[in-house]
Amino acid sequence: MIREYIDRAMDQAKYEILPEDQSYYGEIPACQGVFANCATLEKCRKELEEILEEWLLLRIYKNLSIPEIDGITITIKEASAA
């Protein structure tokens, strides 16, 4: 489910070329704080995906909400005490 979430989020990524240095800037608008800036579009996509994965893991670890993307939700359930 996490892989599918990442794939769908990456489909929503927005990219632009920054006029100051002609580098590529990418972000996923639904995921606040997930952005990357690299010299090439390929590197920007790769870094953006890595940042998204780290962002997801941090939100899961801290039990923070994760926005729904294309009908996919990730919910954290409390572990029961053994």
Regions from the PLM with identified roles:
Residues E16-P29:
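Short aromatic-glycine-(Arg/Gly/Cys) micro-motifs in beta-strand/loop hairpins
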Residues D11, Y24, V34-A36:
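Structural detector for hydrophobic anchor residues on beta-strands
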Residues M1-K14, K46-A82:
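Short, charged, surface-exposed hinge/linker loops at domain edges
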Residues Q32-K43:
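A short, exposed loop/beta-hairpin motif centered on an aromatic-Gly-Thr core
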Residues P29, G33, L64:
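Flexible, active-site-adjacent loop/turn segments at secondary-structure boundaries
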Residues E20, C31, A79-A81:
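Generic structural motif
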